[in-house]
Amino acid sequence: MATHFERQLEELHVQIITMGSLCEKVISLSNRAIRGDKCIQEIFDTDKEIDTKEREIENLCMRILLHQQPVARDLREVSAALKMISDMERIGDQAADIADLSKFIEANHVEVPELIGSMAEMTVRMVTESIDAFVKKDLKLCRKVIDDDDQVDDAFNQVKEELAKLMYQNLDAKAGLDLLMTAKYMERIGDHAVNIAEWVEYALTGIHRNNEHQMGGSQA
């Protein structure tokens, strides 16, 4: 029979998965919005759901820390969850920023580079895999997410080059800047997915890549 502590950890996993799913949804919606889909309000609503979920998970983590006083790997897991939800909340904010930009992109009838859509797909996958790595305690998977960030960065650099060429030809400078900022927000979402994966790695090993956050050693 599961202990109360084990049930709380399971609830934490469920809540993290739910918040991760909301992040996946809001990224996909933002990609649709820049292509003219009427989903801007849904993006803002989902961002609010993410904010609410962050507060709920914070409260759960604080209850676990105060009442259960976990040690070693369990403590790292709860501590990592607190850091992860901060990055997930930022993903929602940046998707909302993309939604704001989409209004101007649509108004100017600008064709959106396919690479921006590819960036959205990559970041959705990275968020999914980083959350899976947390729940499954899969060190290999979280390191894959960290490595995959290079693909998002490469795509962003290609978008910059493509937009520079289009602006040199006949693309309106304001429209080009809006598209560039959209790609930049997607690139930042990828960075947040990496941050999530790095905190998963910390939860599993006790060592953060920045070597600033070490707690409980490298043993479970």
Protein language model features and the residues they cover:
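Cytosolic, long alpha-helical scaffolding segments
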Residues: 1-220
